[in-house]
């Protein structure tokens, strides 16, 4: 049996060793997980687990991000297309109003330069 007076000596001996080993034990799972993730690959980890549920959640999260990104790109393309259309219309209106053709007028609803006599589109 161990005597009570030996307990403090035992604690003084093993406590520093335990404290030195704790960081190594703490880092071992992280090193094992990062070893499976190679450079250049996309590694997604949710909570550090490799169970099928966390993989499915990561897949769904990635899929949702991809869909959001795709929609964002569509919206940006639409805005850019509308801006270009309006920009061309402003240039066409300026050209129509500065035209030497006295019968040319700008139709704001259709955003075209038309001939007053025939109603046909003209290029000033």
UniProtKB/Swiss-Prot annotation:
Residues 47-68 are annotated as: Disordered. This is UPF0482 protein YPTB2194. Transmembrane segments: none annotated. It comes from Yersinia pseudotuberculosis serotype I (strain IP32953). It comes from the Bacteria. The keyword Signal applies. The keyword Signal applies. Keywords: Signal. HAMAP family: UPF0482. Residues 1-32 form the signal peptide. Belongs to the UPF0482 family.
């Amino acid at each position: 049996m161990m005597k009570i007076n030996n307990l403090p000596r035992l604690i003084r001996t093993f406590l520093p060793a335990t404290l030195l080993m704790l960081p190594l034990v703490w880092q071992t799972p992280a090193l094992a997980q990062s070893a499976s993730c190679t450079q250049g690959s996309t590694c997604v980890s949710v909570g550090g687990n490799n169970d099928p549920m966390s993989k499915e959640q990561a897949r769904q999260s990635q899929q949702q991000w991809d869909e959001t990104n795709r929609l964002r790109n569509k919206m940006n393309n639409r805005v850019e297309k509308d801006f270009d259309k309006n920009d061309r219309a402003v240039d066409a209106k300026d050209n129509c109003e500065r035209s030497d053709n006295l019968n040319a007028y700008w139709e704001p609803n259709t955003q075209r330069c038309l001939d007053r006599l025939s109603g046909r589109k003209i290029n000033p």
